[in-house]
Amino acid sequence: MDASFFIAGRLRFKGRIAMVSIAISYLVIIIAVSVSSGFRQEIRSGLSKLSGDVQLMPPTLNVLDAGHPIDEDASYMPYIREMDDVDAVLPVVYRAGIVKNGEDIHGIIIKGVPRDAGFISDAFPADSVRLPVSIPSRLAEISGLKTGDRMLTYFVGEDIKARQFNVVSVHETMVETDDRLVVYADMEDMQRINGWNPGQVSSIEILLKDNDEEDIVRNAEEAGTLVNAYSSDDDPSVIAVSSVSSYPQLFDWLDLIDFNVLFILVLMTIVAGFNMISGLLIMLFENISTIGLLKSLGMTDKAISKVFLSSSAVLVLKGMAAGNILALVFCFIQNTTHVLRLDPENYFVSYVPVNPDLATILASDVASFVIIMLLLLIPCLFISKVDPAETVRVK
């Protein structure tokens, strides 16, 4: 057994305050990392549901224009579906409308999707309900509409159309991106309202297996290349647009959160490191005679430093474990209860999302542990200044 570790096991590091500080630092670090990951996961998922990761749309970039449909069976679509990262391809029909309920009037966007679309298939009944829609909870709140009500909607164009939709469900909006209220309807109903033939849609949304920003941008470029390469003369003109370019403010905001998390990680690591430095200095002063004795027995400064660094490392690991456990408990409680709420108009989501990614937590733990141990090399310089002749007294 290494003599340094043997001696370290018999030294007592009286650093409860330092250990508490380390535990708090790791608690804050892990929560910050989990919240950042949670925001990114929720907003990506919400945007993917709202408009897909990549959209094929008319060059006008206006999916609400009923005068420029595209073809969901265009000649390039088989190649789009065969892209490696594509998880699903969803044709959709958009139309802006005005909802009137009593004296209340609200502008909405109706998004017609196939009835078998994964996130809406359970909401739409399989029976013969005419013009079923699923409305967002925000619209239900401000208009007073609820499941079972009829929703009178006006469509303004060359001539005004009115339809009585039936509210079959109320869904929670995952991401509040702007003031628009998106109502989900049956795509075939919306095609009839727009006066379109089957196969004509407003846009085609591509959902990816991995919606990381770089993957989204890369797949949008690949989709655009395939469209240009395999379009026929009969296909309407389309362009591929990524959600990153459609909602740059959201991704910029996520990058800002990541920067803040990095700042917190560095700050809390430095705080924990300096608390450990003060604790280690106290330990060195209390054991100055022991240091002198070890030197007189022929132990090198490096070996003696290993003694105290080993003892300090045990304390750091204990604080790390305590902080990690407390952080994971917090994440579990927040994920199950959503006790910490947010204003979605400012934060895009209605509660604090947490996603304790184990790989990220492990990387944060290792990085902060290495930094703290490097900082502890500073007080170890004191060991070289100890003179055995002055510290060891023979009685």
Region roles according to the model:
Residues 31-107:
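Hydrophobic, regular-secondary-structure patches
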Residues 33-38, 258-296, 304-307, 379-380:
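A hydrophobic alpha-helix feature that marks transmembrane segments and, especially
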Residues 381-395:
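Short cytosolic juxtamembrane segments of multi-pass membrane proteins
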Residues 281-283, 288-334:
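Transmembrane alpha-helical interface segments in multi-pass membrane proteins
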Residues 318-364, 377-381, 385:
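Short helix-loop junctions at transmembrane helix boundaries
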Residues 1-29, 40, 45:
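N-terminal Sec/SRP start-transfer signal
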Residues 14-16, 215-274, 283-285:
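Peri-transmembrane interface segments
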Residues 74-199:
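A structural signal for hydrophobic secondary-structure junctions
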